[in-house]
């Protein structure tokens, strides 16, 4: 009985690894959002602004200006002459309200960046703590995975490796990498930059492909040569 209980110990450990970071991130965002909002609005901090984000804000203001003024530019003189002062005042108030709304949206973006970045740091600290304190559970989980892989046939193993490699470094993988890197890039508070994301998308698959080839050559050739033969046959 104690042996069976010990064998089942990694199950709650695995469940906590999966669900605890999500729960902490959600609770953290809900509990600290009012405080962060107050802190950001009162201090009007510019610590988290970078050049790319400033350019994005300027672009939004330019778009707002074009939205309100471009269509009216030709009729501006007639509007001033023919429109009463109250209509012109309403027009200015409308621009002022839209500008305030844009500033609020800009502040909300930065508040969410701070919350997500802080939650990511906390999740990373939790994972690190679990890795250090849960040595025994990790050993048992590792033995489970190794036993599961050992019981698979070489054909299934080769098919799984081929499927994973096609998903990660195959012909259609750049689109998935672009979505994933863009999501992580945004989640950590960096402004969207097509050049940087394109560079990462073109670099990561190449690095993974090199690591995979080294792993197949250095490790699988010694452990299971038949698996390597089946993999190359499927790949061809």
From Swiss-Prot:
Keywords: Antiport, Chloroplast, Hydrogen ion transport, Ion transport, Membrane, Plastid, Plastid inner membrane, Potassium, Potassium transport, Transmembrane, Transmembrane helix, Transport. One of its GO terms (cellular component) is chloroplast inner membrane. GO terms for molecular function: antiporter activity; proton transmembrane transporter activity. It is found in: Plastid, Chloroplast inner membrane. The chain crosses the membrane at residues 8-28, 113-133, 161-181, 196-216. GO terms for biological process: potassium ion transport. Its main location: plastid. It is a multi-pass membrane protein. It catalyses: K(+)(in) + H(+)(out) = K(+)(out) + H(+)(in). InterPro entries: CemA. Belongs to the CemA family. Contributes to K(+)/H(+) antiport activity by supporting proton efflux to control proton extrusion and homeostasis in chloroplasts in a light-dependent manner to modulate photosynthesis. Prevents excessive induction of non-photochemical quenching (NPQ) under continuous-light conditions. Indirectly promotes efficient inorganic carbon uptake into chloroplasts. HAMAP family: CemA_PxcA. This is Potassium/proton antiporter CemA. It comes from Drimys granadensis.
């Amino acid at each position: 009985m104690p042996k069976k209980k010990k064998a089942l110990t990694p199950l709650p450990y695995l469940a906590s690894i999966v669900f605890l970071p999500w729960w902490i991130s959600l609770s953290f965002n809900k509990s600290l959002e009012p405080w962060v909002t107050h802190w950001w609005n009162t201090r009007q901090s510019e610590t988290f602004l970078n050049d790319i984000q400033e350019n994005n804000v300027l672009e939004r203001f330019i778009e707002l200006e074009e939205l309100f003024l471009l269509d009216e530019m030709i009729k501006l003189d007639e509007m001033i002459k023919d429109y009463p002062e109250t209509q012109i005042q309403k027009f200015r108030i409308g621009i002022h309200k839209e500008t305030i709304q844009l500033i609020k949206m800009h502040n909300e973006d930065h508040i969410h960046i701070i919350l997500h970045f802080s939650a990511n740091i906390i999740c990373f600290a939790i994972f690190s703590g679990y890795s250090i304190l849960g040595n025994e559970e990790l050993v048992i989980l590792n033995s489970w995975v190794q036993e599961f892989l050992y019981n698979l046939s070489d054909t299934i193993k080769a098919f799984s490796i081929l499927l994973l490699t096609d998903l990660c470094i195959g012909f259609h993988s750049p689109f998935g990498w672009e979505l994933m890197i863009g999501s992580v890039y945004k989640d950590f508070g960096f402004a969207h930059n097509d050049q940087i994301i394109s560079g990462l998308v073109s670099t990561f698959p190449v690095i993974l492909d090199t690591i995979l080839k080294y792993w197949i050559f250095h490790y699988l050739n010694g452990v299971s040569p038949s698996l390597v033969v089946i993999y190359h046959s499927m790949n061809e």
